[in-house]
Amino acid sequence: MNIKIKSNKNLAIAREKYNNPLSISKKLSFEKWVEYINIHQEYFTWEDDSADGIYRKNNIDKIPEWAREGILNSQKGKALAEFNKKKGWYEVVLSFHKDLGIITTTFQKKIEKKHLLHLLELANYLDALLLIDGKTVIDQQFIEELEEKQ
């Protein structure tokens, strides 16, 4: 079931609402993020373990020096889900931003109820909020109300 959240809305996970992510004072736990993704490997894949991630690791010497540090520091920074074999890419990307202490999302497809439920479960595990544009909280009730409007 597709949920009506406009594609220009940014879904993120943070420990507090925000207008500007630079103003967030309560940061997410990177260790708990890694723990959660490792527990849920049936759905998520670390970018490092994807074909692209393995290629980058195996060819790190061919990458310009100025870009190597960013690649090496991004270990466990992105989790991927729902590989589209026809298109050749993952359609759901979660990015942990250590500097901001938040997780942002990228969807290459319509957001469905199952996506919101996965994100809400992750947010709850991290003792955090699932947010639209940093302001609107998505909880179980929000999802149910969206479903009723369909």
For each feature predicted by the language model, list its residue ranges:
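Acidic (Asp/Glu-rich) sequence patches and key acidic residues
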Residues: 1-150
